């Protein structure tokens, strides 16, 4: 991978990370088209740190409030009984606990299925299938859902279900935001609430995955045939951070006015295009280096 290709992939990451269209699927597809090979799970996870840093910058006030209120309640600022320590009556502390609960599924499944995630699940036929299926689900759920729940209405049950939706994004093509937004809309949350919860809930998962893959890349970069090198990876990460911040602003404005129908149609169209490219042999279903590792 050269630096121009890294810039392109950084742009692709920034444009698709927050939208319910699956950034990992786009990185996988564009990587194959430009490089002739899969950039790999490590590259994908590391450059996602860039887009998640943009999330932290944009939501910095919410994050500071969540952390200060959560720690304050935990250490007895609002009372010594367990309900007070769990954030009773404190919306930010409660949101902090909900984010923790919502992170449980992806942590368990991420560690349990790590080898499968990095090999078998990167098959583009799987990507095509989930692009199509979750595109239809997003379309139907968004059109039929109630729109009366806000972030203050979240329960631990809802948080866990949000987390299950997020954990589906371990499969390239599902989309982290697509999974959580679809679950959120099905549970009756407004579009704005579903998106904000999706952003905040992704922070622990993305940073955890990114830091884990960074450590692995540092240890194995000389022997990992798929890792494109630190120079291009860091360039892509910086590009994804800068452009990602702009995309967040635009996306939040978009969902306050429009439905997710356009994204659902895009997912279905992309699934058809990728399927055709697979059929005619332009794209391989599984990168040879991934197949060898499986």
Curated annotation (Swiss-Prot):
Single GO term (MF): undecaprenyl-diphosphatase activity
The protein's role, per its UniProt record: Catalyzes the dephosphorylation of undecaprenyl diphosphate (UPP). Confers resistance to bacitracin.
Positions of transmembrane segments: 39-59, 93-113, 123-143, 198-218, 232-252, 268-288
Catalytic activity: di-trans,octa-cis-undecaprenyl diphosphate + H2O = di-trans,octa-cis-undecaprenyl phosphate + phosphate + H(+)
Localization per Swiss-Prot or TrEMBL: Cell membrane
Coiled-coil intervals, chain numbering: none
Gene from which the chain derives: uppP
Keyword Transmembrane belongs to the record: yes
Database matches in InterPro entries: UppP (IPR003824)
EC number of the protein: 3.6.1.27
Keyword Mitochondrion in annotation: no
One Pfam family named in its UniProt record: BacA
Organism for this UniProt entry: Bifidobacterium longum subsp. infantis (strain ATCC 15697 / DSM 20088 / JCM 1222 / NCTC 11817 / S12)
Alphabetically ordered keywords of this record: Antibiotic resistance, Cell membrane, Cell shape, Cell wall biogenesis/degradation, Hydrolase, Membrane, Peptidoglycan synthesis, Transmembrane, Transmembrane helix
Name this polypeptide is given: Undecaprenyl-diphosphatase
Membrane-protein topology: Multi-pass membrane protein
UniProt-listed GO biological process terms: cell wall organization; peptidoglycan biosynthetic process; regulation of cell shape; response to antibiotic
PANTHER family reported in the protein's UniProt record: UNDECAPRENYL-DIPHOSPHATASE
Enzyme class: hydrolase
């Amino acid at each position: 991978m050269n630096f121009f290709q890294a810039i392109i992939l950084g742009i692709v990451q920034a444009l698709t990370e927050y939208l319910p269209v699956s950034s990992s699927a786009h990185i996988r597809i564009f990587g194959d088209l430009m490089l002739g090979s899969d950039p790999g799970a490590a590259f994908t996870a590391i450059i996602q740190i860039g887009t998640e840093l943009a999330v932290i910058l944009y939501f910095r006030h919410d994050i500071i409030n969540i952390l200060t209120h959560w720690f304050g309640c935990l250490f007895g600022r609002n009372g010594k009984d367990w309900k007070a320590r769990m954030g009773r009556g404190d919306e930010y502390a409660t949101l902090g606990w909900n984010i923790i609960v919502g992170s449980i599924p992806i942590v368990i499944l991420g560690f349990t299925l790590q080898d499968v995630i990095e090999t078998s699940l990167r098959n583009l036929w799987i990507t095509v299938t989930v692009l199509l299926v979750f595109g239809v689900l997003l379309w139907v759920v968004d059109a039929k859902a109630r729109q009366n729940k806000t972030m203050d209405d979240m329960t631990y049950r809802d948080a866990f279900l949000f987390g299950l939706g997020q954990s589906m994004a371990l499969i390239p093509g599902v989309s982290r935001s697509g999974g959580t937004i679809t679950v959120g809309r099905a549970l009756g949350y407004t579009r704005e609430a579903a998106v904000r919860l999706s952003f905040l809930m992704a922070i622990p998962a993305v940073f955890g995955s990114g830091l884990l893959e960074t450590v692995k890349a540092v240890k194995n970069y000389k022997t990992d045939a798929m890792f494109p090198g630190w120079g291009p990876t860091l360039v892509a990460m910086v590009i994804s951070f800068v452009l990602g911040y702009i995309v967040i602003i635009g996306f939040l404005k978009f969902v306050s006015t429009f439905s997710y129908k356009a994204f659902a149609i895009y997912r279905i169209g992309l699934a058809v295009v990728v399927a055709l490219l697979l059929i005619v042999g332009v794209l391989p279903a599984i990168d040879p280096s991934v197949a060898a590792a499986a």
